[in-house]
A protein has these predicted regions:
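N-terminal ligand-binding lobe of clamshell/alpha-beta domains
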Residues: 1-122
């Protein structure tokens, strides 16, 4: 990862967008999935760089992300392309409540908001 905690994050799945906003870390987000709708202002504030299983790789690279957050094997090709381009990619596979809670805690720790993330999941 270029910076820790990461300063420039691209979110390819809407759950990570919403979580970063809930953690008060929305200023770290530099690009989002076209499906991101929560919170409402995200569509006005952040550039859209991907659909669910496709992404504009050159647009993502132009944003100079420290970290890209992806989802599961469904975005494996996108993740692979970004990794080959030298980008750090973190992939989550939250498919149930426990997985969602774990993702929130892990993402909170990644951006230095462990305590806030713990409050969200409790």
């Amino acid at each position: 990862m270029k910076a820790f905690p990461p300063e420039r994050i691209v979110c390819l799945k809407e759950e990570t967008v919403e979580t970063l906003y809930l953690l008060g870390e929305q200023d770290r987000i530099v690009g989002v999935s076209g499906y991101a709708v929560r919170p409402k202002q995200v569509r006005k504030e952040k550039p859209r760089v991907s659909a669910f299983t496709s992404a504009d790789i050159p647009k993502i690279l132009a944003l100079s992300p420290d970290l890209v957050l992806a989802f599961s094997d469904l975005q494996a090709e996108i993740a692979s392309s970004l990794i080959q381009a030298g980008v750090t990619v973190m992939t989550y596979n939250q498919r149930d409540i426990a997985g969602i809670m774990a993702m929130i805690q892990h993402l909170g720790a990644t951006v230095g908001q462990e305590q806030h993330a713990l409050k969200l999941v409790n």
